[in-house]
Regions:
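Short hydrophobic targeting helices and cationic amphipathic motifs
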Residues: 4-6
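Conserved RNase H-like, two-metal-ion catalytic cores of nucleic-acid enzymes
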Residues: 11-111, 115
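Metal-dependent phosphoesterase core characteristic of DEDDh/y 3'-5' exonuclease domains
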Residues: 13-18, 73-100, 116-211
């Protein structure tokens, strides 16, 4: 696992690994087609993306990427994992996925945090989690009128005040312009990639074909 390689083998960071909740989210545009957005929402999306789009690409053509913004996307799955009995021979890694209706999966994920990962020593971990997964979940909770669990209530905190772990941040070594995908990082470190079955860019098309 990438996290263990970076923290335990490479950087010798001392952590109680049973206190870490690993997570990854999958997101898609809130509505399948740009043309089905309200007129106001179409204008807002055009304004939101005007600096990301090339001049010859319209907002409608760019809409397939709408899932990366919490204001225009929804979460369709939150997958989590955690270690049990890490320090002995009975060590295991348990995995659970919350999927389906977004409101329900957000509530279920919140209950997991509040009931099992609510202490100061508990940490969240993701790849690019601090800039994507953690704030995305928080924003979607607010949009859906779900009060934030303490672990995601990061309002007003500076980056260095957020205790959660980000494997991409570990790899940056202070170079904040550097982006490395999870697939690339696992490849160069010789770790089996968890992202081989489907790429992030294909999630929306697969989701809407099946739903």
């Amino acid at each position: 696992m990438l996290f263990l390689y970076l923290t335990k083998k490479a950087m010798n960071i001392k952590l109680d690994f049973e206190n870490v909740l690993f997570l990854d989210i999958e997101t898609v545009p809130e509505i399948e087609n740009f043309s089905n957005l309200t007129a106001d929402k179409q204008v807002l999306f055009e304004e939101k993306t005007k600096y990301q789009r090339k001049e010859d690409i319209t907002a409608e053509e760019f809409y397939e990427r709408a899932g990366i913004w919490a204001e225009f996307g929804i979460i369709i799955c939150i997958s989590v994992g955690y270690f049990v009995n890490f320090k002995n021979s009975q060590r295991s890694f348990r995995v659970k996925s919350f999927y389906g209706d977004e409101v329900q999966l957000l509530k279920d994920f919140k209950n997991l945090l509040n009931n099992h990962f609510n202490k100061a020593e508990h940490l969240l971990c993701g790849h690019n989690g601090k800039e994507f997964d953690f704030p995305y979940i928080a924003r979607r909770m607010i949009i859906n009128q779900i009060s934030l669990p303490e672990k995601l209530n990061l309002f007003g905190k500076k980056p260095w005040e957020i205790p959660h772990i980000d494997t991409m941040e570990l790899w940056k070594f202070g170079d904040y312009k550097h982006f490395t995908s999870l697939k690339l990082l696992t490849s160069i470190l010789g770790i089996p990639s968890p992202k081989d079955d489907i790429s992030g860019s294909d999630v929306a098309s697969v989701y809407y074909k099946e739903n």
